[in-house]
Amino acid sequence: MTGRERLQAILNRQPIDRLSWTTLVDHVTRAGMPAEVRKLSPFDFYRHIGCDILQFGNYGLSAEEAVLSPSRLTCTEMTCELETEKDGKLTRHQIPGANVTFGIGAETVTGRAVLKRKTPWGTLSTTLENDHPVTYPVSSLEDMRILRSIWEASDYVEQDDMEASFARTERLIGDDGMYVPTVDPSPVQSLLEYEMGVENFYYLFADYPEEMKSLLAAMHAKRLKEYEILARRTPAEVVIAVENTSSAMISPDLYRALSLPQIRDYVDVLHAHGKKAVLHMCGHIRELLEPIRETGLDGINAATPPPIGNTSGEDVLDFFGDDFLLFGAVFDPSVLHKADVSSAELQDHLTRLYTPRLRRANLVLWLAVDGLTTPLQRFLAVGQWMKGREGQ
């Protein structure tokens, strides 16, 4: 089987010729590798280590390799200003409001920056550190109303050339794997992660529950259109929603009340267009598995075992059944990233990990190394072990 055939077989719950594994790298991951390896394109690097290519959206790709989105969020009532500081010099420039979603700039920002969304209803300001919010734009009822007005005045507008860029990226991947489009977090998660943060979210929800529900409804109405456009136009068989959900941020009861109905709607849209729905869940999700199951999803990406997470692949199968898709179950980070871990230790862990049940499962093992400098030897050790299990 080729990598593409193997991943397609897993998606369709068909037998495979060998165990499947993948990874996701960026320039930080490869920073300590030999120069000739750092120069490889992401796809050629994946071929070099021998994994199946499961390209997670556009992560790690250059503009020439990336797939264009079939839609973009536009708001004609909003202008965006980005302030960056380098070597003591402040730079301020306008960026199109159409390119700003959830308060994160269209361009990657290294270092500290301030993003201001200016509207007739007021201004929301976000302080970013390496593209992550360190102060949140929404911390009051007034801010919440501004954000709701932005969403009510926004629309997802279809863009040309997605299909052509998808075909180009698929040609670059070839038979070695597949490109899987990703979608931004659902409304609750985007508020928790980017717009409010956990503390502001719960204070505002406690003080102004109806205003919070109104904001979430406005966001959801627009996000449904985004999902419909993507599901209708993408040639991909599966879509991954990047949820990052964790019981450290939301309780099972609140997940069921707020997140579940919205995610179930998104899953229904994908299914209506013949797509499989997979949720990226890299947090602590054991306590959330019951309401997550009620979304009707087909699989989970990035289920993470202890001690970093609290949910192993077998935990997921215990709850969802052995036909469920583990489309990227995380290799134990405490082993993979252990200082001076040997190839023998990694391979011994793999031997213990792959119980007869997991060998039969619809499983892609995922080495989670994005943003983490990782020795080349660790990938090669996993690849060598996997190759030795062909036909098993």
What is the predicted role of each segment?
Residues 1-37, 116-118, 127, 145-392:
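Active-site loop segments of alpha/beta catalytic cores
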Residues 15, 47-54, 109-111, 175:
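Short, solvent-exposed loop/edge-beta patches enriched in aromatic
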Residues 32-90:
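Segments that shape or occlude catalytic/ligand-binding pockets
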Residues 33-35, 61, 68, 129-130, ...:
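Short aromatic-enriched loop/helix-cap "lid" or pocket-rim segments at secondary-structure transitions
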Residues 86-102, 121-123, 127-167:
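A gly/proline- and charged-residue-enriched helix-loop-helix capping module
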Residues 92, 109-118:
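Generic recognition of long tandem-repeat/solenoid scaffolds
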